[in-house]
């Protein structure tokens, strides 16, 4: 890795892309010059549209890829057209919608409602092989499946509705067993906790169905399109597929997604499923087609809803069966066996009610007599039951219907009765007799005094006492963690030394060497000997230093104001009050010479009372007064100068105010501003007809008057006070007590006609004080921290850890720099680690660290900061501040390299930025592991989350355990934004109407329409989710909500009238605080939610009123539309509006690189077109066109020559002052005038930009302009004040965009989510451009937080552009995300952990141990015992999860011993180094090593005739081991393709026996250890075991069960079981096909074939191939270090990696490696 890669100007190896030039057809006749530069540049990757690898658009320079043509952009067709004939081919139609197997948890957990088709769920549950349909099924099994299926979604925050279509009853009724199973399941649900969620509809044409979808806008419908299996029903008459397909298709046409009800895997923090995305569908005949496929039988629905039969009359299931049997018998259709079967049903019910799931059955009789009569009688009974169940009223019913029917029990009893055996248990004879009589049965039952049906369940042998294989364990750590190890036994116990050591075998037979694999960043850099190379390196460092300074200054905005003076000793640090007595004497806890203070005191001078002043103090005081007087005179001169700037005076004085130091000059400055603002309003907005304009214009004036009254009154002179009072009174407000306004002021010529309370609420929300308690604190410089921020400083001073939760832009990051400063001051060796979630944030932190701490004198060979990512490192082991990503810190913490261990021992603090990533990223488990592994204090900075207390509870408990109670984690939770957010929605024309042909469209007079968040609420969603806790209305919105509620309720109008509520008289100088505003808001919210349950009519009225302004826009967006086209059509109109209203700079977020670039170009093209058009006008030609430029050049030269002559001669004393060069140079003057005239066609940010910074950035970028097209494009865009930012840009381009936007040279920036996580890019407006799947509520909160940043804006704007109605609702109504605990560890992670703990102790230069085994074991113990999942998962409440984790650790140790990767003591051995190095391959890594140890690869290579064949053979194996991309369910294999597989064929036959042996051993061990986790030692849940179809040996744990039959509290995660099933099947027994993209690409090398044949989106293809190539590289390096250089496997892997990498780079136009 390059040492300077993070900041190097040169492109990374993947950044320079050469592509063929192909024209891009833009929708305009004339293309300005900027469009031409884009003809070669089309970004290939759409990073969010279906990309599973990187939802957050990870900013890897390596992902810069270009397209050959528009088709290769991988855009999905926006519109699907279906004729009536095509509609009949429904499966083919569904296959045209984008479908992928992905993590869908962000689509529903805590954010959205989804729907589940219960009819389909019943069909799919019934399809599981562990059902016993030979005996008409068992209610317990089916109902338990449904309960478990629903509960797993409830556990992760899912909210859903269960939908039933009554017309399907006709289909179900064709089979009695199926009909009864459905009715029983529906009755069970109606009588359970989900009763309110159960909704009935006739069919998809039902108006109520349409209303539900419109009211709830669910995220998706969960449904399968498959028919019932033959195992359940052999009848060919039943065909549910057509109806299910029409339901799914209908939902997709309504802009709602579909999740298929098979292969759904609910893990700890993810839900994997087949997800079908909707598109715009044009199908004129759809409604007719839909109606033709449904009966529209309203009678069936009425039967379901009639509730004629009160079920509270039945106390037990036996009571219900008596009623059923009586009704059935009354039909007179029963045969001779009816009474016997009925008696068996009643007795079965009594037995099951007594025994529950722990029941036994009679053995199956070989002489059983079950003729057709029995089947007819069973149908008669079950049909009678269906009639009752379908009309059941479950109100007040306590009847448990979960175990209504057990066919196995019924038939076993029936067979015994038919054989005249005694069956009736003695204890049940009285109860049975009662029911026997009620049912009118005549068949007698003999009493069984032995009560066989009540025999105890056979005891289960402890799974740990007879393991299939057992290895010795001597590690004290693992024995303490898993005490059950002591009782583990096996008949196949393996004694040490009795099994062939694979490593020794390979050393002896193949001369393998097993060299250690050292981290590249830990290797010493080679010393540069060559003088020229040394000079070049020094120049590079100098250049980097200049770049650091430039970047840092743009980042912080205050230049050297934040630069820390390390010669200064900070004053005041916090200590725990009860510990102050001792530490006051010693000074412990602070820096050298630092004075202590009480927590939160702020270090204010003069806090201690002094008895008297010394002479020295008096002299110092006199000197200070003299100095202040000089400062005051200087500042007054500046103010006077500002007052002389005419129209610009207010702007000048406003900018000057923040730089003034003295209170009297600050007061004078505010006074002068107020006077000038008042004069402007008097001149321009006087008169009653301009009152509304005057109200808006007076906001700044009122704010400055407020400052005069509140802050500066004591420092104003009398005349100034009088003038301030006059201004106040002239606005229509009462004069302050004791003041006398002038007669002119009393005329109130500027009367606003509104009192102060209402004025602040309606117009002046920015005037409302946040009351954050800012105070000067000597511990920080440059600003006064708020109260909650001082708590953060106190926490660091006390040496505690802290969890800091605050909204984006609240100001929580600065504490990390205080922490860094403290460590830098205390030592030259100690280290602070800053963990960032993205490399964009890494660059920012580097800049901030340099800006603040570059003055520190570092030891020789040590840098201030270093960076470490997976792609590059810079001074990683030679720095005091390491800035890294989670994966790399984990590698550091568990490294066994001595140099790395020594570095880790110096880590004193770790800062985790954006720690909420613990539940929102693919690396979330690593965040959790790091928080447990580190043994030093930490700061965890997080955005607002839902379960902050749960997160704090976990962190605090683990921290106290790690520190033996000496440290704790302080929770600092702050919820207030500094800037209000005003929401609005883009005003568009109907996207489904006719196109007016305009290039840049505009709908009406307003470009945007204000959006009240409550305007998108729906009553049902409010009931389920309530109002988000963090949703804070603006002052205007609070007033609006009050007005709407007051309209419909007089009590609310009186009780919450603002003036009355605040207890203030509005005509006086009343200043509302933010806390008072929140008090009013919360009171209104509380009343609002009360009405939701008590008076829904009021709620509907209010919501209708609030929705009215945006109702049209919401209806436009309710149907699918071409989102990209809408954004492109309206972007110019929108930016024009923002520019006119002064709401730039703006960031437009689009998680699609192509969209970012397209919108930027569209906007720039229009500005250029306008400029060219203006240059053709007479005005331009007459005023600004430069004519005869050559003559002007000559004239300017002549003037300069004359000036030079005069300078050389004697100066004429009488001559006037010398003229400026511009005055002498007419051409320069004309050019300047021209530039000012054309400035209107450019966009500028804050303060108009900095020309010097712009020139430096352009110069820096132009170095790569010859070879990089995107640089040329950006330079053209920069000229217009426009930019874009995404992961495809290299470091230089991204840095330039960030610097120029912060400096104001860019006003509009189009960005992917690279700028969403903590990057400092303050703007006034945030636009959400084109919707993508990855735009989650959490991401929305982070992105919108960019708007109205503190210190820049009083308020910010959020605009929804091409966002569908359903997504707008989801973003605004979603609850705060609740973080879930991750699976704590995997087998490979435990290998790394065990090897780290049990390594030999390393000594430093002084002969001391860097770390001891005891210390390492203690760190591992905290990780093993304190998983976050223990605090978040239901299974942990009874200790089952804790036991499961212990058993998993013991299983992992046994498996690693079996693979010879660990010694009995736990030391890594043999190929452990390689396994750890290649751990990214997960399960494939372990299997690869197993096969390698068995020399399988060598045998395979020998079986091929050529090297090329060997490479293909090994590649096929590796594709099977390391790729797991599923084909869609609609995929149909084509046999017309040559050389490609499309779907993986599986492993060569040579390897299959070894893989089967490995899988059998691993699975057998896993089953035993997991069974030991259960309460009774049984792997299977007894509710499923009753079917008699479960067998521990035959049931596959890798099968895609919809509901696995494992014990109830088993915590499932696919990462736990380290096997690969190459014949994996779903719950219906269908083989799951895997995509052969990795193999096929090597064969054809074409990305187009990957899209056309393998069905990959181009962005997905890039990431998949990149990851696979990375795995090949790691395997090649690993085997190279293990084997001899000329080993056949080494040669094949190295050649394979080389060839694969070349093909990959060539296919995607990337620069090949040297």
Curated annotation (Swiss-Prot):
Its Enzyme Commission number?
A: 3.6.4.-
Q: What is one term from the GO cellular component aspect held by the record? A: cytoplasm
UniProt-annotated location(s): Nucleus
Domain (Helicase C-terminal): residue spans on this chain = 1237-1391
Q: Where is this region: Disordered?
A: 47-70, 584-616, 1197-1223
Gene3D superfamilies listed in its UniProt record? P-loop containing nucleotide triphosphate hydrolases
Assigned protein family: Belongs to the helicase family. SKI2 subfamily.
- Annotated organism of origin: Caenorhabditis elegans
This one is known as Uncharacterized helicase C28H8.3
By its UniProt entry, which Pfam families does this protein fall under? DEAD (PF00270), Helicase_C (PF00271), PIN-like_DDX60 (PF23002)
Chief location category: nucleus
UniProt keywords (A-Z) are: ATP-binding, Helicase, Hydrolase, Nucleotide-binding, Nucleus
Per its UniProt entry, which superkingdom is the organism in? Answer: Eukaryota
Limits of the Helicase ATP-binding domain: 793-963
For this UniProt entry, the molecular function terms from Gene Ontology, in alphabetical order, are:
ATP binding; helicase activity; hydrolase activity; nucleic acid binding
Q: What class of enzyme is it?
A: hydrolase
Residues given in the record as ATP binding sites: 607-614, 806-813
- The UniProt entry annotates the motif DEVH box at 913-916
